[in-house]
């Protein structure tokens, strides 16, 4: 009798794979999820899932407040495995205030450099004149006055 009760209890639980709660997600990022869901549905009526790790909170601009990051690496479409990512990586959307910066990357981290926060992303090696395994990185800093991400292309002297 106990196994039947256990199975009945499981049947009342909500599905976990698609049940990531997005109620607190800012509108600018909710729009990104909605567009992804629609793009997936357009490919043979695919089913979209937002997997764990899709949303991250971290201080991107050094104001000691947690900003928002939406990682397309945690998007899944049942009918198009590579719809959101490629060998170049996946797009991550970094929300500071009301500004979204979207950057394709193969991974990212935030570092403290002096009094600045630096968004460091790994780029496809072709962005540095090489190929896929070539080490290549982009460093960006948030400019709070202009409300833009700032970076410079590195040049070797």
Q: PLM features: residue spans?
A:
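N-terminal signal peptide c-region/cleavage motif recognized by signal peptidases
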Residues: 14-16
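Acidic/hydrophobic-patterned starts of short beta strands in beta-sheet-rich repeat architectures
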Residues: 60-73, 113-124
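Mature extracytoplasmic domains of secretory-pathway proteins
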Residues: 65-66, 76-79, 84-94
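Beta-propeller blade signature
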Residues: 87-97, 137-143
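Short, flexible beta-strand-to-coil junctions
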Residues: 72-76, 96-98, 122-129
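Repeat-based blade/solenoid architectures
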Residues: 45-54, 101-113
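Acidic, small-residue rich beta-repeat scaffolds with periodic aromatic anchors
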Residues: 3-5, 18-32, 36-44, 108-157
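Short consensus segments that form the blades of beta-propeller domains
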Residues: 45-46, 79-87, 127-132
